[in-house]
Structures are given as structure tokens and as C-alpha cells.
């Protein structure tokens, strides 16, 4: 049995510690190992408690962690087991105790309390925030009213919120009053009162409207572009959902008009031209009723019926939230349903967000593409390639991008055909006969061009009725197979051909590293997974300010890194020049460097 005596080797190690003025974890680990290695396995049956008086300041958790590493690495498993189970209990007590003197008066400089490597220092040196005065000057009255809080301070407070992922403005106001680095960034002394959260909230709800936020967002992008950090040759576009501040159980069903497509007029013109080329009557967009009574009786269509039909065609039923009516019901799979907004975002190769458009969560990515694309192309005409996933592989988007002289790089899009039927590629289009050849080598002739822009090719029902593979082709009662082809399908085939080229295939692989990383950082580091705001305008301003903060953060880090790299380059180049001068003087004294 263990007699409870402490080995002399341990006292010698402790004495060595007392003579030293520094106490590192390596020294503690070596001391504990000296003590533990002198014990025997008989300590399993007893409980050893050692008190050591060390006049040093050190965290107990670090000591225990060090002891655990020592026992697990340098001793046998049995000793580690004894320590973990509490058979050996090592307690280190400190003689020196800190007396809490909270009323001590000191003279300090807030500049000295903020580390030189702090992110806010990098941001402060990266841009000149005085530019904000030009954006908000017309929003303030200069000759009457109470003195206002500096608008730069208000924008900096919101910038702090998005940089550090603080969810509410109330929490931002509390953090600013407590955090010394935040006070330094805003220009407040330690004992100076900071703005109330209600002031911050009121200004960003009623004064700094959407136009002001857009100016801030574009100003930061201009600063980044002027320094040469933007590379908009390839732009990556995608959308991400943001959970709305709305209860998914509080909802109503409502009939809303179907939103007209932006390219509806252009599409209708080409549809009518295609119908006329095939000898069909063009569509009349106004759908005027027949004028004569004989025509009304012949068509069995009255004026009231046409109005009712027109009304029914342009209305649809949607699920609306009673809490936030401007949000949309986002459906993903069979079970995931929630009210959300969607941020359709575009970024360039370095990860800077160059454009964003916020829509309700039930708006498809391809519908919001035009707004994002037009915004990016207007600011950066040098864009050459648009990289997007298969959701953007639609005839209109392909036509729009290729007609502008740019390239659309997309992925494979799964055909939306019935499982078990003939695959789509077995229906071959014959351009000479303007017909489709089915797997049974029968021709499907042109029938019409519908209002959605699709040419319809129909089979002969007498042939299909006796076809042995009809069950793999169609289940229609009249035995007619219909194959549709969009009038802009050639642009989709061009995008499919580009997908197989090595250059654009490698470029598409970067999509997950660029735009997906932007979304991951925004949600994990900057609290964009859930919005506390309600209403499309408020959420859009919130998203744009968040992306502006992310751009500014990335820009400040890049600029600080380049500054340090230039400093190191100057040091090494000077040292190399001096060394080369000394060497050349020894080899050829007559050669000197100026």
C-alpha cells in the first residue's frame, strides 16, 4: 500500500519552479511527470492529494490539461486511467490571490487598447468613411431641428452588426457601449454615452431608404475596383433562401394575378412570326371578342365568357403569410415548407458580391435572373462568362446571354420526362422535314406553336394505335404522342455544347468555391440564415448592407495583406541589394551599385 509520502524528486522539481520567474506549460508537465513516474501502481488502492505552493499566475485549466497530456503521452495507460478516475488527485493551489479593485482610477489611451491586427483597424485604414456624408447630405435639414447623431457613426454601428453577426440593433447598441474596439472604431471615449438603439432603428427604417443603401453598396464596390481587386470577367449567379420572420402556420389562400414575363412581348412577336411561317394565324394578344352575332353563335363564345376566361387564365392561388404578406412560401421536398425570402446574388472570381436582388421565397431563380444580370452587366460591361446552375438553363436566359455576346456556363439539366418511357434523346428532330422521328421510325408532323413558345409535333393516331411500344411512348386515350420544342431551343443546345468544353467545365467547378462560399459565410459567420425584418424593402436593405460589410471585410484583409507583403519585399530587396553590393565590391571593387 502507498504510505502517503511525497518523493523527494517532486520537491526538487517544485524548488526549481520557485527559483524560476516564468512558468510555462512545458515546465509544469515536466514537474508532474517527475512526481508521477516515482509512484507505484499501489496508488490504485489509495488517494493521493498533493498541495504545492507556487507563487505564479497560471490558469488551473491549463495545468490540468497539461497534466492530462503528460500522463497520457509519457506514462502507461494505467497511470492515465488512475488520473482520469480520480485515484490520483493533483491540486495546485495559488498563494497569490487577486484582490478585485474595481474602483481604481487609471489614465489610459483608448488607442493603445486596440490591437494593431484588429479587423476594425484594417477597415478604418482601407476606406474613407467621410464619403458617406455625400450620400446622406440631402436627408438632413441644415437650418433647424435638434442636432443629429453623425450618420457615419450610424452606418458604422450597422457595419459592426453585420461584420460580427449580431442579430438585433438593440444588441448592437449594448455591445458598442461595452466593447473598447467598437468605441475606438466609432470615435467614442470610454466614458462617453453611445447612441440608443431606437435612434439606430428609426434612421434605417425611415431615413436611410433603399437608394441610400444602394449608394453605400456601390461605393464599396467602386473602392474595391479602383484598387484592382475585382475580376468580373466571370460572374457566378445563384440564389439562397433566408427564413422570414413569420409563423408558417399563420397563412391564408389567396387569388393573385399572374405576373407577366419581362420578355412576353419579344416572345409573342417571335411566336407570331413562327406561326405565320407555318401558315398559321398569329395570336391576338388582346383577345377581342367576335363583333358579329353570327360569329358569336358560331364560336359559342359571349363577351362575358371571354372576360371570365381571361380573368381565370391570369389568376392563380398562392399561400400568403398573415404575419409577413410580402414573403413567399418556400417548398423544398415533401416536408420542408416555410415562409422565406430569396437573395439572388452574383459574385466575381475573388468572392466579392457585385449584385443582389431580393424576392419572395416562391419566386424561381430563372424569373429573377434578368434583374441581377442587368444590374451586373450595366456596372461591369467587361463580363464575358455567366456561370450558373441548371435552374438558369432556360431558353430565355440562354438567348439573352448569347445574344449579348457572352457565354453561359451551366451544368447538366435532368430531363423532366416520365420514368420508364422512351428517353428524350430517342426522339430526333429532322430539320429538313421539320418533323420529329420517334423510336419506331415514325414521323411526328408540325401541328402548331402555342402561346408559351413551344412548337408541337403530333403523331398519326392510326399508326400509334398499332405500335408495340406505345406504352413506352404515350398514355393518351386518342393515341397521339406530342413532342414540344421551344422556338429558342437552339440557344439551349449551344449552352449544352459549351458545357462539354474543358475551359468552361473547369470554370463551372469553381462555382461551389465562389458563390456557395459566399452564402456559407453569410449564414454561418454573419447571421443571414434568418431575418428579423418584415417587408421586401426592409429585407432587401438588410441583405445589401450585409453583403457590403462582407465585401468591405474581404477588401480590408486583402489590402492589409498586400501592404505587409510590400513591406517585406522592400526589406528583403534592400537586404539583397546590400549583400550583392558587398559581394561585388569584394569581387570587383571598381563596380558599385548606385
Language-model regions, residue ranges each:
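Cationic, low-complexity basic patches in intrinsically disordered or flexible, solvent-exposed regions
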Residues: 17-19, 75, 586-589
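Cysteine-centered motifs
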Residues: 14, 19, 82-85, 578
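Basic, short loop/linker segments at the boundary and entry of helix-turn-helix/winged-helix-like folds
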Residues: 116-159, 164-165
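Short, positively charged and aromatic/hydrophobic N-terminal segments
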Residues: 2, 34, 47, 70, ...
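Short hydrophobic alpha-helical segments enriched in small aliphatic residues
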Residues: 4, 12-15, 36, 46
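Anion-binding and metal-coordination hotspots
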Residues: 96-97, 165-178, 188-594
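Short hydrophobic targeting helices and cationic amphipathic motifs
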Residues: 11, 20, 39, 54-57, ...
Amino acid at each position: 500500500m502507498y504510505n502517503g509520502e511525497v518523493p523527494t524528486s517532486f520537491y526538487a522539481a517544485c524548488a526549481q519552479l520557485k527559483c524560476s520567474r516564468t512558468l510555462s506549460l512545458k515546465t509544469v508537465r515536466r514537474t508532474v511527470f517527475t512526481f508521477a513516474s516515482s509512484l507505484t501502481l499501489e496508488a490504485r488502492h489509495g488517494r493521493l492529494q498533493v498541495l504545492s505552493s507556487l507563487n505564479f499566475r497560471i490558469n488551473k485549466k491549463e495545468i490540468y490539461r497539461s497534466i492530462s497530456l503528460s500522463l497520457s503521452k509519457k506514462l502507461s495507460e494505467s497511470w492515465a486511467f488512475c488520473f482520469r478516475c480520480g485515484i490520483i488527485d493533483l491540486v495546485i493551489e495559488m498563494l497569490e490571490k487577486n484582490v478585485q479593485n474595481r474602483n481604481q482610477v487609471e489614465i489610459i489611451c483608448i488607442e493603445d487598447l486596440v490591437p494593431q491586427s484588429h479587423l476594425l483597424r484594417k477597415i478604418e485604414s482601407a476606406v474613407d468613411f467621410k464619403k458617406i456624408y455625400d450620400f446622406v447630405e440631402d436627408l438632413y435639414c441644415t437650418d433647424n431641428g435638434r442636432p443629429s447623431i453623425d450618420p457615419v457613426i450610424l452606418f458604422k454601428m450597422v457595419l459592426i452588426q453585420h461584420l460580427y453577426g449580431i442579430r438585433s440593433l438593440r444588441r448592437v447598441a449594448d455591445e458598442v457601449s461595452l466593447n473598447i474596439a467598437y468605441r475606438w472604431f466609432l470615435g467614442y471615449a470610454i466614458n462617453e454615452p453611445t447612441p440608443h438603439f431606437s435612434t439606430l432603428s428609426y434612421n434605417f427604417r425611415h431615413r436611410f431608404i433603399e437608394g441610400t443603401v444602394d449608394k453605400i453598396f456601390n461605393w464599396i464596390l467602386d473602392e474595391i475596383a479602383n484598387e484592382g481587386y475585382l475580376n468580373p470577367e466571370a460572374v457566378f449567379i445563384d440564389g439562397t433562401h433566408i427564413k422570414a420572420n413569420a409563423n408558417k402556420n399563420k397563412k391564408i389562400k389567396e387569388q393573385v394575378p399572374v405576373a407577366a414575363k419581362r420578355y412576353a412581348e419579344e416572345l409573342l412577336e417571335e411566336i407570331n412570326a413562327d406561326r405565320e411561317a407555318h401558315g398559321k394565324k398569329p395570336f391576338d394578344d388582346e383577345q377581342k371578342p367576335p363583333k358579329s352575332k353570327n360569329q358569336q353563335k358560331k364560336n359559342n363564345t359571349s363577351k362575358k365568357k371571354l372576360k371570365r376566361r381571361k380573368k381565370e387564365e391570369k389568376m392563380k392561388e398562392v399561400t400568403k403569410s398573415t404575419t409577413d404578406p410580402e414573403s413567399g412560401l418556400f417548398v423544398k421536398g415533401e416536408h420542408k415548407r416555410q415562409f422565406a425570402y430569396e437573395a439572388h446574388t452574383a459574385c466575381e472570381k475573388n468572392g466579392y458580391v457585385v449584385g443582389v436582388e431580393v424576392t419572395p421565397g416562391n419566386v424561381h431563380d430563372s424569373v429573377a435572373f434578368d434583374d441581377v444580370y442587368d444590374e451586373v452587366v450595366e456596372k461591369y460591361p467587361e463580363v464575358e462568362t455567366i456561370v450558373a446552375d441548371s435552374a438558369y438553363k432556360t431558353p430565355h436566359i440562354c438567348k439573352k446571354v448569347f445574344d449579348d455576346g457572352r457565354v453561359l456556363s451551366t451544368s447538366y439539366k435532368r430531363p423532366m420526362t416520365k420514368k420508364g418511357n422512351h428517353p428524350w434523346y430517342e426522339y430526333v428532330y429532322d430539320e429538313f422535314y421539320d418533323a420529329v422521328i420517334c423510336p419506331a421510325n415514325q414521323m411526328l408532323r408540325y401541328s402548331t406553336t402555342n402561346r408559351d413558345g413551344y412548337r408541337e409535333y403530333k403523331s398519326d393516331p392510326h399508326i400509334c394505335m398499332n405500335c408495340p411500344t406505345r406504352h413506352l411512348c404515350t398514355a393518351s386515350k386518342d393515341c397521339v404522342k406530342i413532342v414540344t420544342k421551344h422556338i429558342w431551343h437552339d440557344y439551349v443546345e449551344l449552352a449544352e455544347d459549351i458545357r462539354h468544353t474543358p475551359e468552361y467545365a473547369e470554370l463551372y467547378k469553381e462555382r461551389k468555391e465562389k458563390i456557395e462560399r459566399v452564402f456559407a459565410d453569410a449564414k454561418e459567420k454573419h447571421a443571414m440564415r434568418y431575418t428579423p425584418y418584415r417587408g421586401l424593402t426592409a429585407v432587401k436593405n438588410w441583405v445589401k448592407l450585409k453583403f457590403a460589410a462582407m465585401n468591405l471585410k474581404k477588401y480590408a484583409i486583402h489590402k492589409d495583406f498586400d501592404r505587409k507583403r510590400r513591406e517585406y519585399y522592400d526589406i528583403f530587396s534592400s537586404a539583397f541589394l546590400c549583400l550583392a553590393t558587398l559581394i561585388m565590391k569584394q569581387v570587383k571593387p571598381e563596380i558599385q551599385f548606385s
